[in-house]
Amino acid sequence: MLLRDAAYELGGGANEAVNFTCVTSDAALVPSDEVLLYGPDMKEIKGDVPFARIVILGVKDIDVEKKDAAYAAIRNIEFVKYHVFPDGYMMRVSPESSREQIRVSKKAVKKGISFYKVGCDFIKQYKKNPNITNVRVIFVTKDVDFKALHATAKKIEDVTKTMNTILEGMPEDLDCASCSFKPVCDEVEGLKELHFGKAAKKEHHA
């Protein structure tokens, strides 16, 4: 999509932009599919605005003892955002900085494109994955604490990178004290157990 065909850009120019995905096996946190919007919808936006897209996924417990299957499940979840192509909604994603900028066409705005419709497209794609039970998609189009959102995105990226590295195969006799992932493992419950093959399913009490 050429710039002259765009009505505006979400996260364009000097505006903030961030996206990240959280995963939980606690069904109470994502009891149903949902699309939430904080800020103006697409038909109300008149120029470039800040933008965030946050996804919270409810997933089945992944059997980490089957490391190849667990690794594939995590990677498949990450790739969903590259398979959503709403008409007139062009995504530019920078994995290194967790930025996601969107160019929205004038034609799409006239046709009634909305965040609800785009969110439903994301949900449809995510739920093709049999490990995913429910999806909450959150869009933000106004000024909020983007510094905190970027910090959260960085933390999630570090955890995902650590999990991927563990599942790809780390020596079980590795000295944790000398490992670059130690700060992440110290903070996130279960990563050390995952590394040493002792992951146990947590019991959920009502």
Enumerate the predicted regions with their spans.
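Long, charged N-terminal interaction/targeting segments
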Residues: L2-I138
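Histidine (H) residue identity feature
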Residues: N15, H83, H150, H195, ...
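Cysteine-cluster motifs in flexible loop/terminal segments that predominantly coordinate metals
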Residues: K154-G197
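Polar/charged alpha-helical tracts
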Residues: D5-Y8, A69-A72, D121-K124, K147-K154, ...
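Extended non-catalytic scaffold regions that mediate assembly and binding
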Residues: M1, S98-K106, N129, T133-F146, ...
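Short Fe-S-cluster ligation motifs
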Residues: D143-D145, K202-A206
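Generic hydrophobic segment detector
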Residues: A52-V59, P95-S97, F181, K192-K202
